[in-house]
Amino acid sequence: TFVESAGSQAPRNLSGNGHDMSYGYGGSVGFQWSPDDEVTLAAAYTTKMSMSEFGDYEDLFAQAGDFDMPSTWTIGIAVRPSDKLTVMFDVQRIEYSDADSVANPIENLYNCPVFNPAGSLEYCMGGNKGPGFGWEDMNVYKLGASWKASDTWTWRAGYSVTDQPIADSQMTFNILAPGVMEEHLTFGFTQKMKDGNEVNLSLMYAPENTVRGPQNFDPTQDVILKMQQVELEISYSWKR
């Protein structure tokens, strides 16, 4: 890599290398407790997923292509005011700071000798302190409801809202992954057939959201990240 060669070798694993593969390991633990028939409490923790490096992109992501998955904390409650209705509320914490390739700010690159002769190679692309997406830790709040209208129909709806993980000072690198969504709305149903088979439908809509900020290498230009999402899933399950 550029860093491993002490800057004498041009970066060869930066872009245009097609697909790459990574594998990793992690763990999860959780508990669920129902003090009575109407209330269920739950909590879960998922460790950071330690992933193998993307060798074909070791000059792009920090730590020679390392791209770990962040740890998460989740707590939730489900309340059943009747036999037909269940209301659920979750709070989830995503620790993007666990993963340097995700959390490192793009300003780290300014300490690379290419930009700062007195700097260190570890701040260059692919270095141990190389630039990343600059994503911040975030909290996600989720509210959902499930209504069993009959023995054959169950309806569901949900809403989630979160902090914006991308600061307007981190625009250029995030062109690769413009994850600017803050809200998601979901709707769906399950229809149980006479033979016990089921038809499931779910619809997710994320309203358009925009983040705007200066281009990190030319502040006279603005970068606009905009995204809107729609997802439809239909499935059919049967019992033998």
PLM feature spans:
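Outer-membrane beta-barrel porins/channels
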Residues: 1-240
